[in-house]
């Protein structure tokens, strides 16, 4: 017992010394940055990163790179900050660190500070999503998608925000963003189409709960939609009935519904493609023998279905939803 206690105390002392050492190093690096010696400080950060990694001090390396990136961002040094941000990801990958909310929030913070138009940001988010999936082949952790969506929403990048909301579990946030997107960029005649596309895509992703939440929230909060159901817009009534039919799972109801609302469904050629997939997922409709999907259509559907073939360095960039206007 005494030996174990002594070992624990020694470990605590070593940990305290390590933290103290990191803090001293950070102080020196911060002083270099404050003096404007950006290049020298950047190279020092990189040297220390690889030294820590070689010693398997992954947490220290990650924390130092994260604080360094934030420091460079605060001084407008985008390239140096982005480089250290990528090293944060490298430490996570090599240490095989488990996904945790705190880490996802740190990554989202770094993303939010990057130049929205920089290629480094695209590379960072693609790699961050891949790490956050934990090797599951999915398109990234839902919480990280949510955090990215919120940042992009603040930047009024509605299209990319929408993509990330679709891969999160935040139906309410998605609906609120779509209300703003519709009122800011859409035509009044398209208010129903914004939410219809989102609901159909959520269903294609087998996320029935978020599909229902996004529809209810959007129709309640959009200033151009009068109380319902039933609604003035036939397409909204179709979506309302579809969500009820999905709960029931009766193929005859689904088939009649799609036939009756064909005039509304013809407003966007993608609707029937989505409904083919929804029929397979929720109503036991057999898949088509040969796929008619190609080009942009096929890429979009593959992304929405969570195809592992789309899971690569550029999947986030290539899988953005189509514009409505």
From Swiss-Prot:
Its main location: cytoplasm. GO terms for biological process: protein insertion into ER membrane; tail-anchored membrane protein insertion into ER membrane. It is found in: Cytoplasm, Cytosol. Belongs to the GET4 family. This is Golgi to ER traffic protein 4 homolog. Keywords: Cytoplasm, Phosphoprotein, Transport, Ubl conjugation. Residues 194-270 are annotated as: Interacts with BAG6. It comes from Bos taurus (Bovine). Residues 306-325 are annotated as: Disordered. Ubiquitinated by RNF12, leading to proteasomal degradation. When unassembled from BAG6; ubiquitinylation is modulated by BAG6 quality control role and effectuated by RNF126. GO terms for cellular component: BAT3 complex; cytosol. Component of the BAG6/BAT3 complex, at least composed of BAG6, UBL4A and GET4/TRC35. Interacts with BAG6; the interaction is direct and localizes BAG6 to the cytosol. Interacts with GET3. The keyword Ubl conjugation applies. As part of a cytosolic protein quality control complex, the BAG6/BAT3 complex, maintains misfolded and hydrophobic patches-containing proteins in a soluble state and participates in their proper delivery to the endoplasmic reticulum or alternatively can promote their sorting to the proteasome where they undergo degradation. The BAG6/BAT3 complex is involved in the post-translational delivery of tail-anchored/type II transmembrane proteins to the endoplasmic reticulum membrane. It comes from the Eukaryota. InterPro entries: GET4 (IPR007317), TPR-like_helical_dom_sf (IPR011990). The modification Phosphoserine is found at residue 11.
């Amino acid at each position: 017992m005494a030996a174990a206690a002594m070992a624990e105390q020694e470990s605590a002392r070593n940990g305290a010394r390590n933290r103290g050492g990191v803090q001293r190093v950070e102080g020196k690096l911060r002083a270099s940055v404050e003096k404007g010696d950006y290049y020298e400080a950047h190279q020092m950060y990189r040297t220390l990163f690889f030294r820590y990694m070689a010693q398997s001090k992954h947490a220290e390396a990650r924390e130092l790179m994260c604080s360094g990136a934030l420091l460079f961002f605060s001084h407008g040094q985008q390239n140096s900050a982005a480089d250290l941000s990528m090293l944060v990801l490298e430490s996570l990958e090599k240490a095989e660190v488990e996904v945790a909310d705190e880490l996802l929030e740190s990554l989202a913070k770094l993303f939010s500070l990057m130049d929205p138009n920089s290629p480094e940001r695209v590379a960072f988010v693609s790699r961050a999503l891949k790490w956050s999936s934990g090797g599951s082949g999915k398109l990234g952790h839902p919480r990280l998608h949510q955090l990215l969506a919120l940042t992009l929403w603040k930047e009024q990048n509605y299209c990319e925000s929408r993509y990330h909301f679709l891969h999160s579990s935040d139906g309410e946030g998605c609906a609120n963003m779509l209300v703003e997107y519709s009122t800011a960029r859409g035509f009044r005649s398209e208010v129903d189409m914004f939410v219809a596309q989102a609901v159909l895509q959520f269903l294609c992703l087998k996320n029935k709960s978020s599909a229902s939440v996004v529809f209810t929230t959007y129709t309640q909060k959009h200033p151009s939609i009068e109380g319902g159901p039933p609604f003035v817009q036939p397409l909204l009534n179709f979506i309302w009935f579809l969500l009820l039919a999905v709960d029931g799972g009766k193929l005859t109801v689904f088939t009649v519904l799609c036939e009756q609302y064909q005039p509304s469904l013809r407003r966007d050629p993608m609707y029937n493609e989505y409904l083919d997939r929804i029929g397979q997922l929720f109503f036991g409709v057999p898949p088509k023998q040969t796929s008619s999907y190609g080009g942009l259509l096929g890429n979009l559907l593959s992304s929405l279905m969570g195809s592992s073939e789309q899971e690569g360095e550029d999947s986030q960039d290539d899988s953005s939803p189509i514009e409505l206007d």
